[in-house]
Amino acid sequence: MAAREVFKRVIPPLSTRLHKGQSGRIGVVGGSLEYTGAPYYAAMAALYTGVDLCHVFCAQDAAPAIKCYSPELVVHPSIVSKRDCEHLNPVAIDNCIETAVDRMSPLLCRLDSLVVGPGLSRDPVMLAMAKRIVEKVISLGTPLVIDADGLCLVEQTPGLVMGYQNVILTPNTNEFKRLCHSVNIDASENCEVAAVQLSKALGSVTILCKGSKDLIATGDDILFVSDPTSLRRCGGQGDVLAGILCAFLAWRNGYQSGRWTAQDQSTDISLMIVASNASSFARKCAALAFEKHKRSIVASSILKEIGPAFDSLYDDEL
């Protein structure tokens, strides 16, 4: 069965019987003083795709801007940054991080999926806290997307996601090379071979390598997504993909728990199916936006095409 037809099973129905939250509660960890757009794009992409609620966990410096971008988002200035800890010693900083993660825990436990990285920056304190959050959600079994600056955590500590079968890494070309280097893999020649080696080195996690053709690898399994897309790469495009992917993982989680249908274990909705559908869908959104805007395309242009693209690919029977 085609990947798209299989994935349609996890899409929640449009029904008055569902209440708020059943179609997905997701979170975005990211947003710093310099980077407030990235978490916004990821969060709004998930909402436009069709999840019900999105929580953005960001630095205090980023919260006012993100709140002003959209009233649809629930924004928590929860992430401790270096600016918050300028006069603290390392032990005090660590205690501050632990306290902040503990305060987030009740919300983290309720999420259907989480994306870590958009706009996170290279702030060492924010990265340290993001690492604790990743450890927490892995202990909960929560589906996880690690993108952008969040991938620095995996570069620094490859064991962080080792063997976790509910995570998708979404590196671009340069991030992919750095991830490969962190586990002594040569990515300079054959990208397919390197992707398989990287996935296996991390315990067969799923990797979605973004490029002119998106490459998805889980262990020895590999596939390409080469659907038409925008001919111009704009800032925020990867954040949109991360948000879509997070939404799709949330739906998979809801489907597997029998939230809107009887539990059906007869068909395994693998992370490769989820990733390939997210890739294809994001490329369709970008292609529609490019048709209208050409060189003027920006990430907000792509957000506006999520609804039409979804109708075209998945809701064509409505």
Swiss-Prot record:
InterPro entries: Carbohydrate_kinase_pred_CS, CARKD, Ribokinase-like
Compartments where found: Cytoplasm
Catalytic activity: (6S)-NADHX + ATP = ADP + phosphate + NADH + H(+); (6S)-NADPHX + ATP = ADP + phosphate + NADPH + H(+)
Keywords assigned: ATP-binding, Cytoplasm, Lyase, NAD, NADP, Nucleotide-binding, Phosphoprotein
MF annotations from Gene Ontology: ATP binding; ATP-dependent NAD(P)H-hydrate dehydratase activity
Keyword NADP set for record: yes
SUPFAM superfamilies: Ribokinase-like (SSF53613)
E.C. no: 4.2.1.93
Residues engaged in binding (6S)-NADPHX: G119, N172, T173, N174, E175, F176, K177, R178, D239
Residues that bind ATP: 210-214, 229-238
Alphabetical list of CDD domains matching this protein: YXKO-related (cd01171)
Family: Belongs to the NnrD/CARKD family.
Record's function text: Catalyzes the dehydration of the S-form of NAD(P)HX at the expense of ATP, which is converted to ADP. Together with NAD(P)HX epimerase, which catalyzes the epimerization of the S- and R-forms, the enzyme allows the repair of both epimers of NAD(P)HX, a damaged form of NAD(P)H that is a result of enzymatic or heat-dependent hydration.
PANTHER family in the record: ATP-DEPENDENT (S)-NAD(P)H-HYDRATE DEHYDRATASE, ATP-DEPENDENT (S)-NAD(P)H-HYDRATE DEHYDRATASE FAMILY MEMBER
Name used for this protein in its record: ATP-dependent (S)-NAD(P)H-hydrate dehydratase
